[in-house]
Amino acid sequence: MNLNLKTVIKTINKFKPLKFRQEVIHQSKYLKIINDSKSTTLSSTVPFLESNEKIIWILGGLFKKGDKFNLNKKYFKNLEAYIYGKDRQVFLKLFKNKIKVNLSKDLRNTLKLIPNLKDIRTKVTVLFSPSAASFDQYKNFEERGRQFNMLIKRYLPIE
């Protein structure tokens, strides 16, 4: 097979990632914002949390019974959870005495709780990885993902 490397690279660069699946919606020197609205379990989120950088984790919705939170303790200090939705108390019990937690009834109010990120000088990732089903407040994960993107622009001005 005879392939032109430039053509292959050009073709690969044309691919667009699927919406709301580990989608980086903002990246600057100190701040990265990821929309992973597709995530509906804790186990699908844990690999993202294994970082030495500060992570602001936004999650919530309908907890899937039997799901486990298996994150190594060494990452707890870098993690702060902002939990919304119907089963926020279920998540609170899972995380109690492990990570710092903030509770809110919905995504809009959750984003209002997050401190201003405009002047940060250390690396921070805002990770929207709900780790739960969306049906308590949204029709599906796509609607939830679109709502997150819209609310980020409104409540976390970053430019």
Please tell me what each predicted stretch does.
Residues N149-E159:
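Short, flexible loop segments at boundaries between secondary-structure elements
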Residues L42, V90, A132-D136:
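Short glycine-rich, flexible loops that bind phosphorylated cofactors or substrates
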Residues M1-N78:
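Nucleotide phosphate-binding/pyrophosphate-handling subdomain across enzymes
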Residues K65-V124:
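C-terminal helical cap/extension that packs against the catalytic core
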Residues M1-L5, K118, L156:
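Short, hydrophobic alpha-helical segments
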Residues V126-S131:
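Short beta-strands and strand-loop turn motifs
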Residues Q137-F141:
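Short, solvent-exposed loop/turn segments at secondary-structure boundaries
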